[in-house]
């Protein structure tokens, strides 16, 4: 009986074990066919975070240069492009301010050399340059240098020609011309260091001038229509001039004092001397400023801007 009971218990145990094994295999098969549930959004998927989402870069490939055909001509070298050169902005010209007179000894003033005439007016001025005969008194001297230095003149002492018988540097005649009522007027001016009929009389500095009136400077043979020499703030007039008072195209005047009256110009038959001619527009800038600014005591520069037109109007001979 005991043996039978033992065998029965063994068979029951084996049946139980076999049933459990079968149940486990069936459950395993069901689990493999069911998908793994996705974790909730609140959890981070480490696998996704570690996975690279940027596509892999394609590695650089070195392209071998193409060998140039030796028969092909070389391309022309392009011209270089240069930046334009900018002109510097000129500095504003400073105001020179008022002219300060620079006086020097009358016998140290150097004249301007007579330039070659270029314009019609310059050629006419040279063509009709007058002669001056010094009857008594000073000879003409330069009045201004290139740098604007001006003659200091002479005191009225000694003989009328004392200290002024001529400059070792050479002398000068100053010219300026323009149209006046259809007639071409050429003014020729001389400077004298003093105007003294005798010692103690007269004044330091003197300016005298003659105006030659012609029909037209721009024709082959211009004609002298009149001559007006200056005399004591006025003029003597010859319309037309006497043939004896003209040498070719050069009128003749004399500088003379009839005591006790000061010196003046008048037409003459006597020949005289000539000087280097410098026209107004040929003077240096400093010389122009000096001539327009300097006061000459009792004498007046006739061809400066302040006097030129008024002198022409007063000397009008027609």
Swiss-Prot record:
Its main location: secreted. Residues 73-93 have a biased composition (Pro residues). Residues 55-65 have a biased composition (Polar residues). Residues 24-43, 50-93 are annotated as: Disordered. Residues 1-19 form the signal peptide. Residues 24-35 have a biased composition (Low complexity). Induction: Expression reached the highest levels at 3 days after inoculation of pepper leaves, followed by a gradual decline. Glycans are attached at residue 60. Keywords: Glycoprotein, Secreted, Signal, Virulence. Key residues/motif important for the effector activities are degenerated in most NLPs, including the nlp24 peptide consisting of the conserved region I (11-aa immunogenic part) and conserved region II (the heptapeptide GHRHDWE motif) that is important for phytotoxic activity. Belongs to the Necrosis inducing protein (NPP1) family. Secreted effector that contributes to virulence during infection by P.capsici. Induces distinct chlorosis at 3 days after inoculation of host C.annuum leaves, and all the chlorotic areas gradually turn brown and become moderately necrotic at 7 days after inoculation. Caused only small necrotic areas at 7 days after non-host N.benthamiana leaves infection. This is NLP effector protein 9. It comes from Phytophthora capsici.
